[in-house]
């Protein structure tokens, strides 16, 4: 009780309570909170100078006492920005400006770390601070200021120690690298333009600032670096990964689209993986779509022999594997229509962009590694992106036979090939069990006055329902990983001002192993293996040395500084808005995998588990893609079902926006999509072959008829067309006569009797004059010729554009679309003028007293020209 009162009084500045507690003899050096902080620490971090002086001068509490992490009250005052308390502690309290906490951080590091330029200025020019001192991880105060985005503090530090502009931490991170990683565009500009920071310096794993910006989804920073810093798209890290690999692996669609639009090449890394492999492996469906329609090889295999679809299926991303196998048989021009229509909402992933204003946030759970530069400065001793190689890091230590047998039996249970019934594997199913014998007692007589009951069935009663087949358990288990997360993991970006530097106590291994996507399912059949699952969360493919390109971070132990603004009695994990590492910091030394803490020592004792089930043999030569789901056919629509321009289909976009994403270009050009919607029987893009035959009446108004359904045999997915509407009540009338449904536009070289399409009788059964039928025939022939000519031009245009790169083809196609739009507007304007002119002519005829319905066309023209009919 006294502890809570003392801490609250120190934080509120309640000097009377402190005096009463001191009078009662309750204030002493042993009065510490859960992190070994004295009331002196709380007064300093709250800026209550009068309480601080009272506790030090009258109560005689030591002003140089240290908390559990080695922080003095001066460290607390610097971290919270209370300059007056810091000045008193350094000048009269006995604290020294160069004192370090357990991580090697001084008060200057903390002031820069938390963005207090006034404190930084006083320490540099009056407090005697040394800006060249590094922490245990090699971080200078300038690194902290760059990562924080504090430009005023950064300018002060650069002016005081200009040699730190290109200084690297123990893992090779420079201030520019950290600024790009955190998305601070103004800091990036300042470092490159005014401080001549080198944008080509690499971290220990070979990553450059361009890679860091692409990995975190900071599109403005990436665009500026490419435009003004003379960096190349093709720069590779030590594993051969480019910026496109990092953007695709994290689902940054805007970054990926910009790279493709500006000429970045789709290349392979040292493990044979393309950006499509990384996107599929991490379940980033929209990135897979962007890469597929921009020419990424769907059948490219990495050095382990896996295609992108294989990796997606292996990691449980069925929506990605289904899409990739569907579009594998399609040409590049038709992949835009091959969206996965059957994907459920829960399978959608949110765009995993970070703090960039042009990107969105991700809720994809991730693990955290102590060696990642994307963590905090506590982790700068092994700045490796998760993308570095894991070759040679497999443990060969043995485990007891019983545990190995348990692990093998568990993997066998997850193997659908071993757990499926024989009938599922293509072998003959065993015969059904014989029906049970009839009962030995006679049935009761039926009640009188009712009909006799029906005879008993001749088949056995159904078996009671059993649990899911093990193959279903396997898939559900794999898919469960993305949902096993604590609330704090929903914020993937751990802000640097929510954690602080501590020396990493991990095993020095950075990066995320390729993990089985769901070993955390709490199922009734898996509960007895819970202990085994806790130690096998980090399973990875035995036959693969290529790491999943998704950086990981482990929480640091710097929870002391993160709780400076917390109330004394408030639990650390209960504070709203707390970062992930704050919640996990109460368990120092434990690695957190997918939201569950695991014993690091026990996990290190376990060797890698047996290999996961092999891929089915059929995957080496994928079968033809199945047809896409059939949408309900409309009664008067003969076109193909639109995949993005209509609102009837599910939106594939698994990001925050509800707008359909155009797969060919980030600029929203839908020309190929519209062309395919209007295509005829073949899959070639023939925008004017609409599958419709237009018949003109005598007044020039068109009447459209849907085409008759034609059987379509193609290995590629096809969309079902609407059937021909019934003749009763739904077909249009032409001069009063029912028009038969004409066939589709004939293929080139096929003769079509146009005259047979024109009716001979009107709606009252009277014959149509021959001259009127001939006029209708000529108009129909002219229209068909125009359509055929337009179709030919469109085919030639598409053939010419197909040989161009995707980004240039997109620009030209957009330009052509703008020209078509201008032409369409001009035609609409002319049509409106013709309608207006016809109205004026009709009004003139009525004014002259003529009945327009009784005039022949030549008489009408003469009257309008001369004002009367010649005698």
Curated annotation (Swiss-Prot):
One Gene Ontology biological process: locomotory behavior
Segments of skewed composition (Polar residues): 352-365, 659-670, 685-707
ANK repeat copies, ranges: 1-31, 35-66, 69-99, 103-132, 137-167, 171-201, 205-235, 239-268, 271-300
Residue ranges constituting the WH2 domain according to the UniProt record: 669-686
Any one annotated GO CC term: apical ectoplasmic specialization
Record's keyword terms, sorted: Actin-binding, ANK repeat, Cell junction, Cell projection, Coiled coil, Cytoplasm, Cytoskeleton, Hearing, Phosphoprotein, Repeat, Synapse
Positions of region (Disordered): 349-400, 416-469, 493-750, 819-850
Stretches of the chain forming a coiled coil according to its record: 772-848
Composition bias, Pro residues: 428-465, 606-629
Tissue-specific expression: Expressed at high concentration in the microvillar parallel actin bundle (PAB) of hair cells stereocilia in the cochlea and vestibular system. Detected also at high levels of a number of other sensory cell types, including taste receptor cells, solitary chemoreceptor cells, vomeronasal sensory neurons and Merkel cells. Isoforms 2, 3, 4 and 5 are expressed in Purkinje cells dendritic spines. Expressed in utricle hair bundles (at protein level).
Gene3D superfamilies membership: Ankyrin repeat-containing domain
Location within or outside the cell: Cytoplasm, Cytoskeleton; Cell projection, Stereocilium; Cell projection, Microvillus; Cell junction
Biased segments, Low complexity type: 377-395
GO MF assignments: actin filament binding; SH3 domain binding
Transmembrane segments: none
Bias (Basic and acidic residues): 522-548
InterPro entries according to UniProt: Ankyrin_rpt, Ankyrin_rpt-contain_sf, Espin/Espin-like, WH2_dom
Residue list for modification Phosphoserine: 338, 342, 517, 524, 556, 665, 704, 708, 714
More details: Jerker mice have a frameshift mutation that affect the espin C-terminus. This mutation cause deafness, vestibular dysfunction and hair cell degeneration.
Domain notes: The WH2-domain binds actin monomer and mediates actin bundle assembly.
Subunit structure: Monomer. Binds F-actin in a Ca(2+)-resistant fashion. Interacts (via N-terminus) with BAIAP2 (via SH3-domain). Interacts with PFN2. Interacts with MYO3A (via C-terminus). Interacts with MYO3B (via C-terminus).
Function as written in the Swiss-Prot or TrEMBL entry: Multifunctional actin-bundling protein. Plays a major role in regulating the organization, dimension, dynamics and signaling capacities of the actin filament-rich microvilli in the mechanosensory and chemosensory cells. Required for the assembly and stabilization of the stereociliary parallel actin bundles. Plays a crucial role in the formation and maintenance of inner ear hair cell stereocilia. Involved in the elongation of actin in stereocilia. In extrastriolar hair cells, required for targeting MYO3B to stereocilia tips, and for regulation of stereocilia diameter and staircase formation.
Entry protein name: Espin
């Amino acid at each position: 009780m006294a502890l809570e009162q003392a801490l609250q009084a120190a934080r509120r500045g309640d000097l009377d309570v402190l005096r009463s507690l001191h009078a009662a003899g309750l204030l002493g050096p042993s009065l510490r909170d859960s992190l070994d902080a004295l009331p002196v620490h709380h007064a300093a971090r709250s800026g209550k100078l009068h309480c601080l002086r009272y506790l030090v001068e009258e109560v005689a509490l030591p002003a140089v006492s240290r908390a559990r992490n080695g922080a003095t009250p001066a460290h607390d005052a610097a971290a919270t920005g209370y300059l007056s308390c810091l000045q008193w502690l350094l000048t009269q309290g006995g604290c020294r400006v160069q004192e370090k906490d357990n991580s090697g951080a001084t008060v200057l590091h903390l002031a820069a770390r938390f963005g207090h330029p006034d404190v930084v200025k006083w320490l540099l020019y009056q407090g005697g601070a040394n800006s060249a001192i590094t922490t245990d991880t090699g971080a200078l105060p300038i690194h902290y200021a760059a990562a924080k985005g504090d430009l005023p503090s950064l300018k002060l530090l650069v002016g005081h120690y200009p040699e730190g502009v290109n200084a690297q931490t123990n893992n090779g991170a420079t201030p520019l690298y950290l600024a790009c990683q955190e998305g601070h565009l103004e800091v990036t500009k300042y470092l490159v333009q005014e401080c001549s920071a080198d944008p080509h310096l690499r971290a220990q794993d070979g990553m450059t600032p361009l890679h860091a910006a692409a990995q975190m989804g900071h599109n403005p920073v990436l665009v500026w670096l490419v435009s003004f810093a003379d960096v190349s798209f093709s720069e590779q890290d030590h594993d051969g990964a480019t910026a496109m690999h990092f953007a695709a692996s994290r689902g940054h669609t805007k970054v990926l689209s910009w790279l493709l639009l500006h000429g970045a090449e789709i290349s392979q890394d040292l493990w044979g993986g393309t950006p499509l492999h990384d996107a599929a492996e991490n379940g980033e469906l929209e990135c897979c779509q962007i890469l597929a329609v921009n020419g990424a090889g769907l059948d490219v295999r990495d050095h382990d022999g896996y295609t992108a679809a294989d990796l997606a299926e292996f990691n449980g991303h069925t929506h990605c594997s289904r899409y990739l196998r569907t579009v594998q048989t399609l040409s590049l021009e038709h992949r835009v229509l091959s969206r996965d229509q059957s994907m459920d909402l829960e399978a959608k992933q949110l765009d995993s962009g970070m703090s960039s204003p042009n990107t969105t946030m991700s809720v994809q759970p991730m693990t955290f590694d102590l060696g990642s530069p994307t963590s905090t400065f506590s982790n700068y001793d092994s700045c490796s992106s998760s993308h570095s190689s894991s070759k040679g890091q497999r443990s060969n230590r043995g485990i007891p036979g019983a545990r190995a047998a348990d692990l093998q039996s568990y993997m066998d249970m997850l193997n659908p090939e071993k757990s499926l019934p024989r009938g599922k594997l293509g072998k003959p199913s065993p015969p059904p069990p014989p029906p049970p014998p009839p009962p030995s007692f006679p049935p009761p007589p039926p009640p009188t006055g009712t009909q006799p009951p029906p005879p008993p069935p001749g088949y056995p009663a159904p078996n009671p329902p059993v649990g899911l087949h093990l193959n279903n358990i396997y898939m559900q288990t794999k898919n469960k990983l993305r949902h096993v997360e604590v609330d704090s993991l929903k914020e993937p970006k751990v802000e640097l001002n929510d954690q602080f530097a501590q020396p990493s106590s991990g095993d020095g291994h950075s990066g995320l192993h390729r993990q089985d996507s769901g070993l955390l399912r709490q199922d009734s059949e898996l509960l007895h293996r819970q202990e085994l699952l806790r130690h096998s969360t980090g399973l990875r493919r035995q036959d693969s040395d290529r790491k999943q390109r998704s950086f990981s971070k482990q929480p640091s132990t710097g929870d002391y500084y993160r709780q400076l603004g917390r109330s004394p009695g408030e639990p650390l994990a209960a504070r709203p808005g707390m970062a992930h590492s704050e919640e996990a910091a109460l368990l120092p030394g434990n690695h957190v995998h997918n939201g569950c803490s695991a014993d690091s020592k026990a996990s290190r004792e376990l060797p890698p588990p047996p290999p996961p089930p092999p891929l089915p043999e059929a995957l080496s030569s994928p079968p033809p893609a199945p047809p896409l789901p059939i949408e309900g056919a409309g009664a008067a629509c003969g076109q193909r079902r639109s995949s993005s321009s209509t609102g009837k289909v599910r939106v594939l976009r698994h990001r925050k926006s509800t707008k359909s994403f155009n797969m060919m270009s980030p600029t929203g050009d839908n020309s190929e999509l519209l062309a395919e919607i209007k295509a005829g029987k073949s899959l070639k893009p023939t925008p004017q072959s609409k599958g419709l035959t237009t018949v003109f009446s005598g007044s020039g108004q068109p009447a459209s008829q849907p085409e008759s359904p034609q059987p379509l045999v193609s290995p590629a997915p096809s969309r079902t067309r609407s059937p021909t509407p019934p003749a009763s009540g739904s077909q249009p009338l032409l001069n009063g006569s029912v028009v038969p449904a004409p066939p589709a536009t004939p293929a080139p070289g096929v003769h079509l009797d146009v005259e047979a399409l024109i009716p001979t009788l009107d709606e009252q059964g009277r014959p149509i004059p021959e001259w009127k039928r001939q006029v209708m025939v000529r108009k129909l022939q002219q229209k068909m010729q125009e359509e055929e000519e337009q179709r030919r031009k469109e085919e030639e245009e598409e053939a010419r554009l197909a040989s161009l790169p995707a980004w240039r083809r997109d620009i030209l196609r957009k330009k052509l679309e703008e020209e078509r739009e201008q032409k369409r507007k001009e035609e609409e304007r002319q049509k409106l003028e013709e309608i207006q002119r016809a109205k004026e002519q009709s009004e003139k005829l009525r004014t002259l007293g003529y009945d327009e319905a009784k005039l022949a066309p030549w008489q009408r023209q003469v009257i309008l020209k001369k004002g009367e009919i010649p005698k």
